Amino acid sequence: MSATATLPAVRGKLTPQAPLAPLVWFKSGGAADWLFEPKDVDDLADFLRDLDPAIPVMALGLGSNLIVRDGGFPGVVVRLGKAFAKVEPIDATTLRCGGGASGILVSSTARDAGIAGMEFLRSIPGTVGGFVRMNGGAYGGEVKDILVDCDVVLRSGERKTLALADLGYTYRHSELPEGAVVVGATFRGRPGASAAIQAEMDRISASREASQPLRSRTGGSTFKNPAGHKAWQLVDAAGCRGLMVGGAQVSEKHTNFLINTGDATSADIEALGEEVRRRVKDKSGIELQWEIQRVGKAE
């Protein structure tokens, strides 16, 4: 797809050859052919309906769980802005959340409304759209535990509300169709005291700060935990703590995190991940699966 291709008219913002490195946590990777920031759901649905179906579409949240390859993304990247970031209680235990709302906003709104069970979202560095797509989870909670339903715009531009059962959730995976964009979700918790909810959020924050390289350029958890194992322990046992490829390094603080030490390319980061997978397979016989999404084309 060329940046001169004719795209449907929009009311939001459409940027050709948009650099993606500033928008992802690793701060590496190439440009998107187009970056689309829709004004509202109608704008998004109309655009996808009229867009050539051969053009790939990818939703981008906070860019935390993502490697964008150095050749960029050959298609349209959709980024939901403030119009999609609202969170509001709809009853004593239920929140209605926009697809662009952060986990921090959802969990703090739940706290203020006295809704427990969503504290774990405080620790997920992403948006509702991202963690609904991948059944995000941490600290004993997963999206499947709180999701009632979600609103999506399919690649065809059709709008649909999908119930929890429609998503086919497994560990860090859903059956959400390719090119679909999650524009909203309904989460249900349980009644709780705001002070106790805040205390649990504080505990989670302190645990993350102590154990994860939060101030580094990282993508979050790199590999899924295999059944009965912790990925970080397998990586450590294979001698990969501190291992480097180019400017990419396995974190000394938490071995299931890769970090960009300053000048890493996405190729460095992905190659490091593959080298870790190879060493773990050689050491333990276990084949680690990527949790981080890798998209786009190599340079």
Swiss-Prot record:
Pathway: Cell wall biogenesis; peptidoglycan biosynthesis. Its main location: cytoplasm. It catalyses: UDP-N-acetyl-alpha-D-muramate + NADP(+) = UDP-N-acetyl-3-O-(1-carboxyvinyl)-alpha-D-glucosamine + NADPH + H(+). The keyword Secreted does not apply. Keywords: Cell cycle, Cell division, Cell shape, Cell wall biogenesis/degradation, Cytoplasm, FAD, Flavoprotein, NADP, Oxidoreductase, Peptidoglycan synthesis. Gene3D superfamilies: 3.30.465.10, UDP-N-acetylenolpyruvoylglucosamine reductase, C-terminal domain (3.90.78.10), Uridine Diphospho-n-acetylenolpyruvylglucosamine Reductase, domain 2 (3.30.43.10). InterPro entries: FAD-bd_PCMH (IPR016166), FAD-bd_PCMH-like_sf (IPR036318), FAD-bd_PCMH_sub1 (IPR016167), FAD-bd_PCMH_sub2 (IPR016169), MurB (IPR003170), MurB_C (IPR011601), MurB_C_sf (IPR036635), Oxid_FAD_bind_N (IPR006094). Residues 208-224 have a biased composition (Polar residues). Belongs to the MurB family. This is UDP-N-acetylenolpyruvoylglucosamine reductase. It comes from Sphingopyxis alaskensis (strain DSM 13593 / LMG 18877 / RB2256) (Sphingomonas alaskensis). The lineage of its organism: Bacteria, Pseudomonadati, Pseudomonadota, Alphaproteobacteria, Sphingomonadales. The gene is murB.
